[in-house]
């Protein structure tokens, strides 16, 4: 079953390659959506994919896909009404 979530990721997640390594993980797993830096220093991820694969992706995000990053907290919000994406993009 397809699922969509918003992940608000806090920690050392800007200026360390976090968005680009998140994209690599998403592409490898077949996850679609976006990742973007936020003004408060966090990173916002909108991710869509099959339930089990999406859980793998979320686990990778929580573990920080980049060795120079650090994830302190992830706020996960299920999304209901999301436009379909055909790829995973770094925004901004």
From Swiss-Prot:
Record field: catalytic activity: an acyl phosphate + H2O = a carboxylate + phosphate + H(+)
Top-level EC class as recorded in UniProt: hydrolase
Disulphide linkage map: none
Entry keyword set: Hydrolase
Acylphosphatase-like domain ranges (all copies): 4-92
Lineage: superkingdom: Bacteria
EC assignment: 3.6.1.7
Residue numbers annotated as active site: 19, 37
Keyword Hydrolase among UniProt keywords: yes
PANTHER family given in the database record: ACYLPHOSPHATASE (PTHR47268:SF4)
Family, as annotated: Belongs to the acylphosphatase family.
Protein name as it appears in the record: Acylphosphatase
Lineage, uppermost ranks: Bacteria, Bacillati, Bacillota, Bacilli, Lactobacillales
């Amino acid at each position: 079953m397809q699922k969509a979530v918003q992940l608000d990721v806090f920690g050392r997640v800007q200026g360390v390659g976090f968005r680009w390594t998140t994209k690599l993980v998403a592409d490898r797993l077949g996850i679609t959506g976006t990742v973007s830096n936020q003004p408060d220093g966090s990173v916002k991820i909108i991710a869509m994919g099959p339930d089990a694969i999406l859980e793998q992706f979320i686990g990778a995000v929580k573990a920080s896909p980049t060795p120079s990053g650090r994830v302190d907290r992830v706020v996960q919000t299920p999304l209901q009404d999301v436009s379909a994406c055909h790829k995973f993009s770094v925004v901004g």
